[in-house]
C-alpha cells in the first residue's frame, strides 16, 4: 500500500507516492515547506511512484545519453523505447537506484532501496530530475544559479561550479540592506502572463534555503572571475548564450530542448541579462546591484 503526498513548487503541483510506513517529512525534509492539499490527477504536472518492494528490471536496456558526477551523485541517463531511464548512486560504491519515466516526464517509477542510508537524497535527486524536464513544456526552466531577493524583485547569479555564485549572493546580503537569499542552487524560472518569475525550490545545494516564495526577475547575471570588475549588459543572441549553460534539459530530446530554447528566447527579451567580471568583494556586489536594481543597463 502507498500514500500520496502533494507538493507545489513554482506553481506546479506534483505527487509522490511512497510506501506506507515511509515518512515523507523525514525522508524529504526540504520538501516540507512545499506540501499542499491533494488535487485531481489531471492537475498534477507529474506523478512519481516509489516501489514498496523495489525490484530492478531483469533487462536494463537503453542507449546511454549521459554520465555525470555532481551534486545529484553518480548518474547515468538512458533513452529507452518508452521514455528514459536513470541510474543514481550517492557514492561510487553505493547501491544503484533506478528511475523510469515516460518521454514527457509526466509519470515515473522509482526503484529505491530503502535500506540505503542515502535513500532520501537519492529520491530527492530523482524528483529533481523529473521536475526539471516536466516543467520545460510549460514555459519554465530549472536553472543552476544562486538567487537573492531585494525590494520585491529577485536576481539570479549563474556560472560554472566554483565561480562564486554563492559568494556573490552572500556579498549582496552582507553589503546591500534588505537582501535575502531565495535559493542557493536550483531555482525554477517561468514565464507567467508575459512576466518572468523565479521561485524557490526544495533543491538548494549545500545551503538549507527552502523557501516557498516567488518574485519577478529583476536580472540574470553570469559571473566570471577576473582581476578587475566589469559589468557588461547583453541582449538578444548574446543574452541567450549567457543563459543557456546551466539550464536543465536533455539535449538529445528535440521537443524538450526546443521548449527550453523557446523559453530562453523570451527570458532574453524580458529581463536584463549581463556578464559580470568580478572579484569576490564589495565592489562587485555594489556595482551589480546598482546596474540591475536601479535599472541602469544601457540599451
Locate each region found by the language model.
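A noncatalytic interaction/capping subdomain that flanks phosphate/NTP-handling catalytic cores
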Residues: 1-156, 161, 171-180, 188-299
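Conserved glycine(s) of the Walker
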Residues: 164
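Hydrophobic positions on the alpha1 helix immediately C-terminal to the Walker A/P-loop
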Residues: 168
Amino acid at each position: 500500500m502507498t500514500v500520496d503526498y502533494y507538493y507545489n513548487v513554482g506553481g506546479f503541483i506534483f505527487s509522490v507516492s511512497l510506501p506506507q510506513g515511509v515518512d515523507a517529512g523525514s525522508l524529504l525534509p526540504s520538501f516540507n515547506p512545499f506540501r499542499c492539499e491533494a488535487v485531481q490527477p489531471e492537475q498534477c504536472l507529474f506523478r512519481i511512484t516509489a516501489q514498496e518492494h523495489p525490484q530492478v528490471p531483469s533487462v536494463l536496456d537503453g542507449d546511454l545519453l549521459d554520465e555525470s558526477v555532481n551534486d545529484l551523485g553518480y548518474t547515468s541517463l538512458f533513452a529507452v523505447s518508452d521514455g528514459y531511464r536513470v541510474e543514481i548512486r550517492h557514492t561510487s560504491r553505493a547501491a544503484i537506484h533506478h528511475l523510469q519515466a515516460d518521454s514527457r516526464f509526466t509519470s515515473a517509477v522509482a526503484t529505491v532501496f530503502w535500506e540505503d542510508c542515502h535513500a532520501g537524497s537519492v529520491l530527492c535527486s530523482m524528483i529533481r530530475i523529473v521536475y526539471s524536464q516536466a516543467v520545460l513544456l510549460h514555459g519554465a526552466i530549472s536553472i543552476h544559479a544562486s538567487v537573492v531577493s531585494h525590494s520585491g524583485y529577485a536576481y539570479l547569479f549563474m556560472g560554472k561550479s566554483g565561480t562564486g555564485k554563492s559568494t556573490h549572493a552572500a556579498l549582496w546580503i552582507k553589503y546591500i540592506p534588505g537582501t535575502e537569499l531565495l535559493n542557493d542552487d536550483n531555482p525554477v524560472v517561468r514565464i507567467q502572463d508575459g512576466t518572468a518569475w523565479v521561485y524557490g525550490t526544495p533543491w538548494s545545494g549545500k545551503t538549507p534555503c527552502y523557501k516557498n516564495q516567488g518574485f519577478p526577475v529583476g536580472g540574470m547575471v553570469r559571473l566570471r572571475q577576473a582581476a578587475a570588475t566589469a559589468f557588461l549588459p547583453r541582449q538578444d543572441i548574446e543574452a541567450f548564450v549567457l543563459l543557456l549553460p546551466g539550464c536543465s534539459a536533455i539535449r538529445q530530446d528535440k521537443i524538450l530542448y526546443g521548449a527550453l530554447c523557446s523559453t530562453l528566447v523570451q527570458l532574453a527579451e524580458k529581463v536584463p541579462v549581463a556578464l559580470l567580471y568580478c572579484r569576490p568583494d564589495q565592489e562587485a556586489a555594489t556595482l551589480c546591484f546598482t546596474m540591475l536594481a536601479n535599472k541602469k543597463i544601457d540599451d
